[in-house]
Amino acid sequence: MPNRRARKKRRTEDFSSSSASENDSDSESVTSVQEEQPDAPETYTIDGLDTQEVSDSTQVRLQQLNADRLASIEQSLSGNLKLDINAVRQIDDVREQLQNEYLKKLLVTYSEDLDALRQKTDFKENSLKTLARLLKESGNIFDDGTLKSLVE
């Protein structure tokens, strides 16, 4: 494959041709452009690189710095994890309060129906607990914003 200088020279010669043979030079320049394919990228290996030997004291110092850096990263991550856990607990507590208020609102709204159920002969104490849990959990169909607006 011709080197770059030869290709460039050929291209320059193609463009500097006379106007009488303009059509011929156009077809030649198209051909020369098509011949111009990028060279395959050179591959490098690390075997051929000159590397400097690092002294033992430098390696020990680098390991110590890496260990210190790793320890500081671990501390910040554990601090962030504690913050996340606390935030999740706070969100869960607020959600629990909203569900309790939702249950109270439902109990007030359906108090007559609940009294009618309690007077039935097949109604038991566990039935009341199950019904209360069911009503409370029905608040899970709403997101926090909707549940808050229902309670207020």
UniProtKB/Swiss-Prot annotation:
Keywords: Nucleus, Ribonucleoprotein, Ribosome biogenesis. InterPro entries: Ribosome_Assembly_3, Rsa3_C. One of its GO terms (cellular component) is preribosome, large subunit precursor. GO terms for biological process: ribosomal large subunit assembly. It is found in: Nucleus, Nucleolus. Residues 1-10 have a biased composition (Basic residues). Its main location: nucleus. It holds the Pfam family Rsa3. Residues 1-51 are annotated as: Disordered. Associates with nucleolar pre-ribosomal particles. Required for efficient biogenesis of the 60S ribosomal subunit. Belongs to the RSA3 family. This is Ribosome assembly protein 3. It comes from Ogataea parapolymorpha (strain ATCC 26012 / BCRC 20466 / JCM 22074 / NRRL Y-7560 / DL-1) (Yeast).
